[in-house]
Amino acid sequence: MPIETEVSGQAPRTLEAWVKLLESVRIPVPKHSYDRVMAAINDNRRSLRDIAELMQDSPALVLSVMREANHPTNASQAEPAESLEIALNRLGLERSALLLRRLPALPIEDIPPVLRQFQLISQHASQQASGLFASRLARLWQEIHWGSLLFLSPLWPLALAHPKLLDTWELRVIHKGEDAAIVEQELFGVRIMALCQAVAQQWRLPQWVTQGYRLLLEERDQLAQVLNIARDEDLLNQQQRLDAEPGLRRWFNQPANTVLLANNLALAAQVGWDNPHLLRWQLLTALYLQTSLEDVQQQVHQQAAASARRHARLALFHPAEALIWPWHQRRPHPDMLA
């Protein structure tokens, strides 16, 4: 039977109440992934890396292990585990198996589609991050990969508890371009990014995740300055302008910003490949990589196709589908077709 997860009654209206609610939601795991991982844990020939690779096909499994390893009662170090392999090593296989046995495992068709759609966006973001940045920052590939996969994870329990609210937010903010602050105050009583930041801190997610939310909430002036430079069509002039402000250059070139760039590329692409929001993040990515907009667009399209080959699922939308559409065509939200 499908899992009953939607919370009845009125949605919370304060940050504290939202965090308390989302902390209590149990996110289901696809049964086929669950069975494969449990078999690997019980096979003494499999390494932690083998198990981590199997787990990454189920974002909910990854999140559960990271949360457990980074919980204050379990964390043996002050800093959160930045990768799944480190988290598994902290827990050990026995405790990891006990954790998995507590998780709800369901046939994938019984997992609510709003949750699966947002997890697909996270998987697409992880592919974009790995393809665009991991080869250039090879020693940091695990931080890039896992941080990108988990960046939007605070939205996953929200997709279970109040799917209609999240769906309405996507319709009005992502598709219709309404003012996010007004819509979010009306729907949630708080800003979505502030809620995600609070949940990420409560879960002690990797620092690159919380740093991304801090940038969006507290460092928007610097982001606007960098975007202004990124709009300059002369690449040499771009670099000269950035070099003229060393503090801004250091701020923008932080490796943690790869997580934010990849997730905004993946989220904006849900509408279509020709929209102003996506263009802004493509321009910022081009400046970060010190290459042209055309080169970044080509790379992003290639990574979208690679993600679709690995992650696309029946009845879910993947932006790679839109690569064969007319360039200016955008994906309408289902409620826009009524």
Spell out what each predicted region is:
Residues 197-215, 219, 223-338:
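Regulatory/sensor and coupling segments of signal-transduction and defense proteins
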Residues 1-164, 180, 184, 191, ...:
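Conserved alpha-helical "signature site"
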Residues 171-178, 230-234:
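Acidic, His- and aromatic-enriched active-site or binding-groove loops in soluble protein domains
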Residues 160-175:
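Alpha-helical transmembrane segments of multi-pass integral membrane proteins
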